[in-house]
Amino acid sequence: MSESVHTNTSLWSKGMKAVIVAQFLSAFGDNALLFATLALLKAQFYPEWSQPILQMVFVGAYILFAPFVGQVADSFAKGRVMMFANGLKLLGAASICFGINPFLGYTLVGVGAAAYSPAKYGILGELTTGSKLVKANGLMEASTIAAILLGSVAGGVLADWHVLVALAACALAYGGAVVANIYIPKLAAARPGQSWNLINMTRSFLNACTSLWRNGETRFSLVGTSLFWGAGVTLRFLLVLWVPVALGITDNATPTYLNAMVAIGIVVGAGAAAKLVTLETVSRCMPAGILIGVVVLIFSLQHEQLPAYALLMLIGVLGGFFVVPLNALLQERGKKSVGAGNAIAVQNLGENSAMLLMLGIYSLAVMVGIPVVPIGIGFGALFALAITALWIWQRRH
């Protein structure tokens, strides 16, 4: 437990293995829990408009704690912060298992996720260095994508068998993540002894927001990534209602399979962007962003499984090609102005605010009785128009 970052910077050190395993199990639990809890809402006859509210309480925790979680990660050993955060997730999942209101339990999971995010990326630079750090980030992303794919499908498949079994599996995944965190070496805090004056912390965070917003390139990146992830999470919930209407399938597993196609496509698109787009040619990604909206519109009109799977894979490819260069631009420019950690925290705030707004509009549309197919058509058209407007604005500035 006393292994030092200075004594072992191997990519496959005990500490690095523990981080990757913990990340996989934690992300697996996050994705499985979403679909397991959605199945619970269906089983308990909650109204359809309440489904996106579940994700809204989750991202609300991110927004509420955005000014503070970065300092928490830097003020304590990051492995212990990760363990505490996964403990909160475990408590939230277990509370849903034992009949506590699912929205309350899921909010607790959101608080844990908000605390976990800055620590999981920050610890990589403390466990390894140099070129190995890039590879470590690659391992982290690979484990996350694998967890999204397997967790989403597992949540839906297990929920079709028994909802309680699916929820229990999520709790076990979080429990495994807590155990894995124990094996992360207890490293020194990066910035101990900082002031915990909440007003000053909030002011400092708002200053970082202002600095990034005043820079044309980082503002462009923030708006683009926020639109993308807001649309992405809304599409997840759109699929849950779209599948029974368009395909006539009422199980919990099919929407998870469709979501998995998007995740696979993102990996392919991200790889293509890495080869074809540089920081100097970021605007090359913009046509892909516009096409996302067009393909969502076409997808909404489908009634057969094969075209639906293919179009969602294409949406993922376009999404990966669109968002990866924007992320790289923000990290590079943000690192020089407000620091990488602050840039990520501001980006998290923007993306989660967009998710909250888009999910709120989607929930309202469902509540007033707009059919899911017209919602999908309008959603795709508006997204394409928004990215077109962003591209025109970027070219003028």
UniProtKB/Swiss-Prot annotation:
Key words, A-Z: Cell inner membrane, Cell membrane, Lipid transport, Membrane, Transmembrane, Transmembrane helix, Transport
Transmembrane segments: 18-38, 53-73, 91-111, 145-165, 167-187, 227-247, 257-277, 281-301, 305-325, 344-364, 367-387
Membrane side Periplasmic: residue ranges: 1-17, 74-90, 166, 248-256, 302-304, 365-366
Protein name per UniProt: Lysophospholipid transporter LplT
Annotated source species: Escherichia coli O157:H7
Keyword Lyase attributed: no
HAMAP family attached to this UniProt entry: MFS_LplT
Membrane topology annotation: Multi-pass membrane protein
Cytoplasmic topology ranges: 39-52, 112-144, 188-226, 278-280, 326-343, 388-397
Record-stated family: Belongs to the major facilitator superfamily. LplT (TC 2.A.1.42) family.
Gene Ontology MF terms in the entry: lysophospholipid:sodium symporter activity
Function: Catalyzes the facilitated diffusion of 2-acyl-glycero-3-phosphoethanolamine (2-acyl-GPE) into the cell.
Pfam families: MFS_1
InterPro entries for this protein: LysoPLipid__transptr_LplT (IPR023727), MFS (IPR011701), MFS_trans_sf (IPR036259)
Main subcellular location: membrane
GO CC field: plasma membrane
Keyword Heme among UniProt keywords: no
Top-level taxon: Bacteria
Subcellular localization, as worded in the UniProt entry: Cell inner membrane
